[in-house]
Amino acid sequence: MRECISVHVGQAGVQIGNACWELFCLEHGIQADGTFGAQASKIHDDDSFTTFFSETGNGKHVPRAVMVDLEPTVVDEVRAGTYRHLFHPEQLITGKEDAANNYARGHYTVGKESIDLVLDRIRKLTDACSGLQGFLIFHSFGGGTGSGFTSLLMERLSLDYGKKSKLEFAIYPAPQVSTAVVEPYNSILTTHTTLEHSDCAFMVDNEAIYDICRRNLDIERPTYTNLNRLISQIVSSITASLRFDGALNVDLTEFQTNLVPYPRIHFPLVTYAPIISAEKAYHEQLSVAEITSSCFEPNSQMVKCDPRHGKYMACCMLYRGDVVPKDVNVAIAAIKTKRTIQFVDWCPTGFKVGINYQPPTVVPGGDLAKVQRAVCMLSNTTAIAEAWARLDHKFDLMYAKRAFVHWYVGEGMEEGEFSEAREDLAALEKDYEEVGTDSFEEENEGEEF
C-alpha cells in the first residue's frame, strides 16, 4: 500500500486536523469510534482508504496521524471531543509550556524537549506501513510551535526518511486577521529553514478563506470552525486520489513531478470550486465548464494574489464526482481560448488532470452545499511571489528597528539567523521573478555584449 502519515503541529495544525479527520471519517463511512457504519459496505469496494487509516485486529480504524502541540489545551479538546476514541492516546502528544508565538522557543528551547518523543511516535506509525509514501504536515507560519517546531521536525524527518516526500499545508498569516505581532518573523524563519526540506507546500491564507466565507457562504463573522471546514474540503480534494480509486489517479510524488519545476519553486496556488451555500446551490447548475472556469477567478483562491499578473508554470486540475474526461477536455479547451492565461514559454501545455468518481461529502450542519462535482486546482504561478513580498515588507519594517528580536536571541538564537533567513527569501522572490522571464528574451540579452 502507499501509506501517508499526517502530522498536525500546533494549534492551527491540530484544529485543521480535527476538521479533516471528521470529513475523512464521513467520506469513508467510519464512525467516531473507528468502526464501520451501516453505509460503509457500499463505500468499500476498494480499500484505498488504508493509505490514511490502519486497521486493528478488532476491526477498528485508526488514522495514520500524529497531533503535536507544545501546550496541552488544544489537544486536550481532541482528547475530550467527539473523536476521542478514533485516535490512539499515544498519537496525541503535548508538552507542558507553549512556544509563546516564538519561533526560537519552538525550534530550540521548548521544541527540543519534545522532538524525540514525536519522532518515536512517528517511527511507530511508519513501522506499521508496508510502503510509506510520505508525510503531510499541517501547521501555521505565524505561531511559535507551527513555525519553530515544524521546521525542527522537517529537518529531522529529512534525516530519518531521506527520500520520502514531505508535503506541507501551511496557514499563511493573514494581513487583516493577525493573531500575533511577530508573525512575519516566524514565517520567514520557518520558510527559510524548511525550504530545502519540503517538497511541496500548499499555502492557505486565512484572509482569503475569510473572504470566501463572507462572499460565497454568506457567513457574516466566520469562526475558525467555518474556516477549517472549508480548508478540510480542500485537503480532502487534494488527497482524494490517494484515498479512493479513480479514473486518473494522482499520488504524492506525481504532484511534485507535475507541479514543481525547480526544487525551491514549490508553492502551488490552491483554488477550489464550487464554494456555495445550500440556498444558492439549489438554483444553480454547476457544470464542469462552470466550476473549471471559476477556478481561474481570483476570488476562489486560497492565497490573495493576482494570477493575471503572473505566469503559470504548471496546472493540476483534480476533479471529483460526476465528471467525465470529455467534459474536462472541452472545459479546458474553452479556457485556453477564452481566458488570458499566460503560461511561461518553456512550459507550453501545462494542464494535468485527475478524476475521482467519489463525489464531495459535506459535514452535516456545515456551511457548504452538497454538490455532485467539485474541482480543486493546484497551479504553480509566479503570482504567489506577491504573498512573499507582503511578508518580507512587514519583516523589514520590524527588523529595521530590531523590534522583538531580544525574545528570539534570549532563547539561544543568533541575530544573524534573521538576516540569513531574510536573504534567503529575497533570493526566493528573485527565483520567482527569473522563472517568469521568457527564455527567448534572455537569449537576446546575451547577444548585446
From Swiss-Prot:
> What cofactors does this protein use?
Mg(2+)
Catalytic reaction list: GTP + H2O = GDP + phosphate + H(+)
- Highest taxon, organism lineage: Eukaryota
Q: Note the coiled coil stretches, chain numbering.
A: none
Any single GO molecular-function term of the entry would be: metal ion binding
SMART domains (UniProt xref): Tubulin, Tubulin_C
Give a GO biological-process term: microtubule cytoskeleton organization
Residues of the active site: E254
Please name the InterPro entries in this protein's record: Alpha_tubulin, Tub_FtsZ_C, Tubulin, Tubulin/FtsZ-like_C, Tubulin/FtsZ_2-layer-sand-dom, Tubulin/FtsZ_GTPase_sf, Tubulin_C, Tubulin_CS
At the top of the EC hierarchy, this enzyme's class is hydrolase
Tell me if GTP-binding is a UniProt keyword of this record.
yes
The record lists Mg(2+) as bound by E71
- Which positions bind GTP? Q11, E71, S140, G144, T145, T179, N206, N228
Q: How is it modified after translation?
A: Some glutamate residues at the C-terminus are polyglycylated, resulting in polyglycine chains on the gamma-carboxyl group. Glycylation is mainly limited to tubulin incorporated into axonemes (cilia and flagella) whereas glutamylation is prevalent in neuronal cells, centrioles, axonemes, and the mitotic spindle. Both modifications can coexist on the same protein on adjacent residues, and lowering polyglycylation levels increases polyglutamylation, and reciprocally. Cilia and flagella glycylation is required for their stability and maintenance. Flagella glycylation controls sperm motility.
Localization per Swiss-Prot or TrEMBL: Cytoplasm, Cytoskeleton
A single GO CC term for this protein reads:
cytoplasm
Q: Which SUPFAM superfamilies match?
A: Tubulin C-terminal domain-like, Tubulin nucleotide-binding domain-like
The family annotation for this protein states: Belongs to the tubulin family.
Per UniProt, subunit arrangement is: Dimer of alpha and beta chains. A typical microtubule is a hollow water-filled tube with an outer diameter of 25 nm and an inner diameter of 15 nM. Alpha-beta heterodimers associate head-to-tail to form protofilaments running lengthwise along the microtubule wall with the beta-tubulin subunit facing the microtubule plus end conferring a structural polarity. Microtubules usually have 13 protofilaments but different protofilament numbers can be found in some organisms and specialized cells.
Q: What is this protein called?
A: Tubulin alpha-8 chain
Source organism (scientific name): Bos taurus (Bovine)
Q: What is the lineage of its organism?
A: Eukaryota, Metazoa, Chordata, Craniata, Vertebrata
